[in-house]
Amino acid sequence: MGQSPSTTAAPTPDLNRHQIPQLHPNTDSDFTDYTLRLSDDCLAAIFDFLSTADRKRCSLVCRRWLRVDGQRRHRLSLNALPELLDFVPSLLIRFDSVTKLALRCDRKCASINDDAMVLISLRCRNLTRLKLRGCRDITELGMAGVGDNCKALKKLSCASCMFGAKGIAAVLDRCVTLEDLTLKRLRGVHHITDVEVGAAASLKSICLKELVNGQSFAPLVIGSKKLRTLKIIGCTGDWDETLVRVGCFNNGLVEVYLEKLQVTDVGLVAVSKCFGLDTLHVVKTAECSDVGLCAVAERCRFLRKVHIDGWRTNRIGDDGLLAIAKHCLNLQELVLIGVYPTFSSLAAIASNCRNLERLALCGIGTVGDAEIECIADKCVALRKLCIKGCPVSNAGIGALASGCPNLVKVKVKKCKRITGKGVEWVREQRVSLAFNYDDSEVEALDGSASDGVGGAQDNTVEFLPTINQTTVAVAEADAEASSSNNNNRLTMLRSRFGFLAGRNLVPGAFRRWSNGDNVSSSSSFG
């Protein structure tokens, strides 16, 4: 019928699209790399905004980008398998400015040995931070090499390693600038005598976590005269004597964290000698009572952060909180878990602690509508509030619609008497308020048990500033298996409850097992 063969229509040009001929890849003669106008520092600053995967891809664009990326990377996270030894020379030639290094290995795999550790320390002489996790084939010889070659080391963290006290002593004797030491689940800890020399003169922070013989490091804790932060978490043995000696010889502590320990009021009274104390965490210490807390409150009047998990032993209550309300007028952060305060103590804190900005009430059967209404009326500076597992109803939450003028965030979880309608009404009244509401069923008691990875900090409320950091990972570290076999679980239970053996607890120490308001103690404002 006179029809011509069909042909592909020419594409309609996009008149709104502006092309720059100089950047078009087909115009080779006119091609200009505009990144050449950027200095290396500027290019490196751009790389800092990229994710780890994107930064890896960018390093393959050209030789200059590869060089800039290698010279400006200060953090490396490596999978510490034995095969890493073959790649260490070339890897650390490329990344010759590394100051922060993490070596991680799965607990079921063999790790790098002393030869690899010494070689790494020779190539990274400017290291300021070193983290070893699961490196079970490194002995005290490898750690001695770290001490000999990394004289600028300031922060050392070791978890699930086998070199024990000898390996730590080898580093401490050689790195006189070490300021921060963290030891978690360290094997081979028996006795140590010379740890207090050398690094004790510069150590400012010590963290001992889940050590079977953690008291082997008591001389180090006592001998560190510049110590500012002390964290002892889940370590076996009686710690009263160590704290008494710390209070006598090292009263400059600013932060003290005591968690899942065999410590009594004797230890708290010793801590009270640190008059400049700023932060105190007393978490699941079954034998601490109002007596020790009152002593700390009366002497440490600069306290700003207090976390108390009474483990529902009913030994910390109104008396201790009234002492805090009376003496700690600068209090900014208060977390109460598993204790039984009444209206009088909470009202005193709300009235006297005018700078209180963060408050968490978790698993407290004595906190109801009246207490929340009092907080809403008197806590003028309050910015963040967490209520979890408390008998509070819509009436109590409704008071937040007009109270606490500076309140920006509220978290409500596992409060059976609070309904979605009550929460929506508060949201309508205060549109700018971030309201996090969870009406899920109440969990079993202590649902946040440590699995050896998350650790004891899962049971506390942490208020941490948001920090944007690009963590560099050249070789992706395998995720450590979170599940453990029956033997590991039995060992963990023994380490947790073994300190209760032979101790005279009050009759109500285990009343929490029969309470109907069981609630997990984990909470967060995140």
What spans do the regions from the language model cover?
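N-terminal adaptor-interaction module of cullin-RING ubiquitin ligase components
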Residues: 1-147, 152-205, 217-222, 229, ...
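C-terminal capping region of solenoid repeat domains
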Residues: 2-20, 25-28, 192-209, 215-223, ...
